[in-house]
Every structure is written in C-alpha cells, then in structure tokens.
Amino acid sequence: FVKTMMRLMKERTTLNVVSDQIGRPTYAKDLAIATIKIVNEVSDGKKIKGIYHFANKGVTSWFKFAQQIKKNAGLSCDLLPINTAQFPTPAKRPAYSVLDTQKIETTINIDIPSWEESLLACQKMLG
C-alpha cells in the first residue's frame, strides 16, 4: 500500500482513498521482529499457546494513512476521501478490522511501535 500510494501520488494530481475502513496498519519488519522474538522464546523453553495478533499501535482509516504517507514524503497530490461503495473491489472489505494485540504484548513482552513511527521508518527504508 505504501509503495503504491507513493507512486500514485507522484503520478497523479488527485487521488481517491477509502475513508470508512478502519484498521491498524502493520509494518512487515515489525511483524518479522515480533515473530523472531516468539521463536527465540519458544527455543528458550517458554510455553506459548493460542492465537496471537500483531499490528502496529493506533487505529486509522486508509484515507488518514494515505494523508500521513503524503505528509512524510512531502508530496502535493490532492487526496479525496471516498466511501467503500465508491471503490468496489472483488473481495468485500470489513469496515472495522482492528486487531487486539494485548495478549502478545503481555505474554511475549513485546513493545509495539505506533503505525506512524513504523510508516516513517518504512518510507525512509524505501527511499
């Protein structure tokens, strides 16, 4: 999403972005770090059972996420909020898809960064 939005914001003067789908954007690098920590804990003999959700801290819409991408990159494309019905996709998307990360934070003792921090790190990595 980040790479695509940055590319489209450079190519276009206006971009429509869905504003009524809420979630927790997740940086793959943060997920990989959490996964490695879990593997290390299991290797050290810790019993870990059940389902654990991971996502960066904070909640946002795709539109607000795109606004932050634009701000971080210093781009000038106009972003227009639209609703899900105005942007049909083959797969139905949930309006609210926020994962609860309390279990992984407390059981594995993982400090999860905010999506804003991780987005900035991702954009710096992308160049």
Describe the role of every protein-language-model region.
Residues 86-107:
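A hydrophobic C-terminal alpha-helical subdomain
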Residues 115-127:
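Amphipathic terminal alpha-helices
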Residues 41-90:
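Mid/C-terminal beta-alpha module of Rossmann-like enzyme folds, strongest
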Residues 1-5, 28, 32, 62-66, ...:
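A general structural signal for well-ordered alpha-helical segments in protein cores
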